[in-house]
């Protein structure tokens, strides 16, 4: 009896501690008042009632169907292999009439882990069910000693259906203060303890199984919490904080238990709608990258990237006709004899020296004299009238050209190699290189243009001033040539004059050997879709119009050949090709790329060729920042505002210029090499690369122009590259093998040498030498001797870069580029794959092309 009192006293202390913790975790509820109706008036009785209520809250909740088994506390059942069932170990372990079990620590852990997740309302119902279980245990206590199998009522141990189907009204007939010191319970617990100690192995297995169930239960609960959190909110950390803190969360859990929705006990955060608000999405923190180098036109940031901001030509920014949206103002600039045009014409003449377009025309000794003659012609009204210049390119020629190029490659793919294309009854050889820029359709166009040019020049010489009628007759011939063809319709803009197609004349930007270069501008229309074919200031599109006239004494055939070759090569390179699926023996092209995959960003677009009288007009893409020569020799004296103050740009001596920053020069070099490689892939070598033939857009996009002296080293009917002989281009950029008499050379290697000279000009601000002949140039002679004796050149060794590694890689590439023996010289493709170029960050992202030209 003393032992029973001591055990009861110990249980009361434990009940007080647990009841106090429950009172701190749960708020008082109105329902809880009804649970104390049958409680005794004595203080120990109340504590004992609380102790039993606490035990029931912790252990008996598994019998409630409203609680999900995933979130239920872990029950400490007997090992499965034992033949006797254990009625309720977790519940009996709190009884004062038994000794503490071996797993009491695990029981306390289970109780304290989940006690905060129960509700008082549910506890009242569970208390009544527990009283019913106590009564049933008394009735079955007699059968325990006979070792009859006891089947527990709850579902985890295969409970009886009769117990679970009993009406809830019968719970009222059972006393709520049933003591735990019942002799039947004491005997049952004694037998249970004896059976639990039946085997040490069984107890160890039971202990491990209990830990595993607890660990799995916690894992499933955490996983379900994360799943619910993702369903109700995009992410828990991103949800706005709750006003009531944890109180709101606990109240939600309490309400969910009371409503029988146990699956929502572990909700975190507030409920949200199915739609996601933009305010709940994570905001991208735009970190402004620090600029570590600012040269005005070139900026370098700390992440290694750079930005070009080249200055737009003053003829665009300062011209009133450009800013004005009235076409009458632009039209007034055409008639130079008007009184209101004197100031505009004077302004244009002052701006001519800003943009060097000598690359568009070959330099000659009488350039200044011809420019004066052109100005005199403009003053006398003898300049080409753009309103009477019409295109001599048949509108259906290029539509048919696209179809022929498509069929050309399809015939190769289908094995129709024996089919020969015919042109006006003449057989054309078999196509073996569909990637070539010059093919059957280009050949037909060359023949047609040559015939028209010759006819126009001869008729002008014989008829005198009847050029206007001849131009109109050509227009009628082109119209008759395209009419009546099946599946073709006349384009609305094909026979419009130059002023209607490309706008009004606004000024002159340069002069050359065969004429001048003017700028035309027109307002944008709905048909102009991005990307534009030329420069735009947002309101208007600008076009460069190159006027070509034969010089006195020039042969017609020579002028005709230059004009047609320049236009055909430029037009073919600057427009998309359609031979995409060609499969050639030993040379696999690409596999179904987009049709415009061949369109190169570094090739100046040639748009149209027009004619008026004995003059011709080539319409091109306009580059608003001028050429590389103008960039290197930018303005001898100029004032630029810098935060309200003016700074004077250093005066540049004649023959030298301001070198570019190494990173800027590297970017331009990479663009130049990609453009030249694109030409080589299509069987064309430029043969006259120099700063005057390299144009720029304000964002730093490089454009290669002037294809008048370009060499077609491989056509569509040639399998191998054919060499050429004779010096071509400007002397400072000509390779040494070109000066060898009667010697043939590879034009692709000549372009590589010229690219190296152009790069050295960018970083040095001057030429390496005037001519690559040792007898005529002492600097080139010293270069040869130093390379032969020391294996290095002092100018290359004095070059500096932003890092020693880049400087070392650049020197290696330069020495390989300036190999006097062309057989040892690096190619453009190899130079692009060098470590120097791979480490160079370029503004243009290039799609890798795998087209190759047969060697």
Curated annotation (Swiss-Prot):
Protein name: Serine/threonine-protein kinase HAL5
Low complexity bias (residue ranges): 57-74, 248-258
Listed GO MF terms: ATP binding; protein serine kinase activity; protein serine/threonine kinase activity
A GO BP entry: intracellular monoatomic cation homeostasis
Protein kinase domain segment(s): 503-837
Recorded GO CC terms: cytosol
Signal peptide stretch: none
Sites bearing Phosphoserine, chain numbering: 17, 19, 68, 72, 160, 273, 277, 324, 333, 336, 358, 391, 395
Catalysis performed (reactions): L-seryl-[protein] + ATP = O-phospho-L-seryl-[protein] + ADP + H(+); L-threonyl-[protein] + ATP = O-phospho-L-threonyl-[protein] + ADP + H(+)
Positions bound to ATP: 509-517, 546
Keyword flag Kinase: yes
Biased composition (Polar residues): 31-45, 94-114, 462-474
The protein's Enzyme Commission number: 2.7.11.1
Family from the record: Belongs to the protein kinase superfamily. CAMK Ser/Thr protein kinase family. NPR/HAL subfamily. HAL5 sub-subfamily.
Positions annotated as active site in the UniProt record: 688 (proton acceptor)
Ranges for region Disordered: 1-166, 214-261, 319-347, 401-427, 457-497
Function: Protein kinase involved in salt tolerance and pH sensitivity, probably by regulating plasma membrane potential and cation influx. Positively controls the TRK1-TRK2 potassium transport system in response to potassium starvation. Stabilizes TRK1 in the plasma membrane by preventing its vacuolar sorting and degradation. Also stabilizes other plasma membrane nutrient transporters like CAN1, FUR4 and HXT1. May itself be subject to regulation by ARL1.
The organism's place on the tree of life at top rank: Eukaryota
Basic and acidic residues bias (residue ranges): 125-139
Keywords: ATP-binding, Kinase, Nucleotide-binding, Phosphoprotein, Serine/threonine-protein kinase, Transferase
């Amino acid at each position: 009896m003393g032992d029973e009192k001591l055990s009861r006293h110990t249980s009361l202390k434990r009940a007080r501690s647990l009841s106090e913790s429950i009172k701190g975790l749960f708020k008082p509820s109105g329902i809880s008042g009804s649970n104390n109706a049958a409680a005794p008036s004595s203080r120990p009785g109340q504590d004992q009632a609380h102790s039993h209520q606490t035990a029931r809250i912790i252990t008996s909740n598994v019998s409630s169907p409203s609680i999900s088994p995933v979130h239920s506390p872990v029950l400490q059942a007997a090992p499965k292999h034992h033949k006797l069932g254990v009625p309720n170990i977790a519940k009996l372990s709190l009884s004062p009439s038994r000794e503490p079990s071996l797993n009491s620590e695990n029981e306390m852990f289970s109780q304290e882990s989940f006690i905060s997740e129960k509700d008082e309302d549910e506890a009242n119902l569970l208390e009544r069910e527990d009283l019913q279980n106590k009564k049933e245990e008394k009735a079955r206590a007699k059968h325990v000693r006979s070792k009859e199998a006891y089947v527990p009522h709850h579902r985890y141990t295969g409970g009886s259906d009769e117990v679970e189907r009993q009406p809830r009204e019968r719970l009222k007939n059972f006393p709520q203060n049933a003591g735990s010191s019942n002799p039947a319970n004491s005997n049952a617990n004694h037998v249970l303890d004896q059976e639990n100690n039946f085997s040490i192995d069984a107890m160890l297995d039971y202990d491990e199984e209990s830990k595993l169930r607890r660990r799995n239960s916690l894992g499933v609960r955490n996983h379900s919490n994360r799943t619910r959190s993702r369903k109700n909110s995009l992410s828990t950390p991103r949800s706005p904080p709750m006003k009531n803190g944890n109180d709101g969360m606990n109240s939600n859990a309490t309400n969910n238990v009371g409503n029988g929705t146990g699956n929502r006990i572990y909700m975190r955060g507030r409920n949200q709608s199915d739609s996601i608000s933009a305010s709940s999405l994570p905001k991208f923190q735009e970190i402004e990258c620090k600029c570590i180098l600012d040269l005005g036109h070139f900026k370098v940031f700390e992440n290694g990237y750079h930005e070009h901001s080249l200055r737009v030509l003053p003829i665009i920014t300062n011209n009133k006709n450009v800013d004005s949206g009235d076409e009458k103002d632009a039209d007034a600039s055409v008639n130079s004899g008007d009184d209101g045009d004197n100031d505009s014409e004077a302004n244009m003449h002052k701006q001519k020296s800003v943009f060097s377009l000598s690359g568009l025309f070959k330099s000659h000794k009488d350039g200044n004299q011809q420019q004066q003659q052109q100005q005199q012609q403009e003053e006398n009204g003898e300049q080409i009238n753009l309103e009477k210049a019409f295109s001599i390119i048949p509108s259906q020629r290029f539509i048919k050209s696209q179809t022929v190029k498509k069929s050309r490659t399809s015939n190769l793919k289908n094995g129709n190699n024996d089919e020969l294309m015919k042109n006006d009854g003449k057989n054309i050889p078999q196509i073996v290189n569909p990637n070539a820029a010059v093919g059957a359709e280009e050949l037909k166009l060359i023949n047609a243009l040559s015939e028209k040019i010759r006819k126009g020049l001869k008729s002008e010489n014989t008829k005198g001033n009847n050029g206007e009628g001849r131009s109109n007759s050509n227009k009628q011939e082109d119209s008759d040539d395209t009419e009546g063809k099946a599946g073709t319709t006349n384009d609305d803009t094909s026979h419009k004059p130059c002023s209607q197609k490309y706008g009004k004349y606004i000024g002159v930007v340069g002069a050359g050997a065969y004429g001048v270069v003017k700028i035309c501008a027109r307002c944008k229309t709905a048909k102009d879709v991005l990307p534009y074919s030329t420069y735009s200031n947002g309101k208007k599109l600008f076009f460069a119009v190159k006027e070509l006239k034969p010089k006195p004494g020039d042969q017609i055939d020579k002028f005709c050949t230059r004009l047609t070759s320049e236009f055909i090569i430029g037009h073919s390179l600057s427009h998309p090709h359609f031979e995409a699926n060609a499969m050639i023996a030993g040379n696999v092209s690409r596999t179904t790329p987009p049709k415009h995959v061949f369109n190169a960003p570094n090739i100046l677009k040639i748009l149209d060729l027009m004619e008026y009288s004995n003059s011709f007009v080539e319409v091109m893409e306009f580059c608003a920042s001028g050429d590389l020569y103008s960039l290197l020799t930018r303005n001898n004296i100029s004032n630029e505002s810098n935060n309200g103050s003016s700074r004077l740009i250093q005066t540049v001596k004649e023959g030298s210029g301001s070198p570019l920053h190494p990173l800027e020069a590297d970017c331009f070099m990479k663009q130049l090499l990609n453009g030249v490689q694109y030409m080589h892939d299509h069987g064309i070598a430029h043969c006259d690369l120099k700063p005057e033939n390299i144009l720029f857009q304000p964002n730093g996009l490089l454009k290669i122009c002037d294809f008048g002296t370009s060499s077609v080293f491989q056509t569509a009917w040639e399998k191998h590259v054919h060499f050429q002989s004779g010096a071509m281009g400007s002397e400072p950029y000509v390779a040494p093998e070109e000066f060898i008499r009667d010697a043939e050379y590879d034009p692709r290697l000549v372009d590589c040498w010229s690219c190296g000279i152009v790069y050295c000009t960018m970083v040095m601000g001057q030429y390496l030498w005037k001519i690559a002949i040792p007898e005529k140039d002492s600097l080139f002679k010293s270069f040869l001797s130093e390379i032969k004796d020391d294996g290095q050149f002092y100018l290359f060794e004095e070059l500096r870069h932003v890092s020693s590694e880049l400087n070392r890689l650049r020197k290696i590439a330069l020495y390989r580029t300036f190999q006097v023996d062309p057989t040892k010289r690096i190619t453009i493709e190899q130079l692009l794959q060098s470590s120097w170029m791979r480490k160079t960050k370029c503004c243009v992202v290039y799609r890798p092309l795998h087209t190759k030209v047969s060697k």
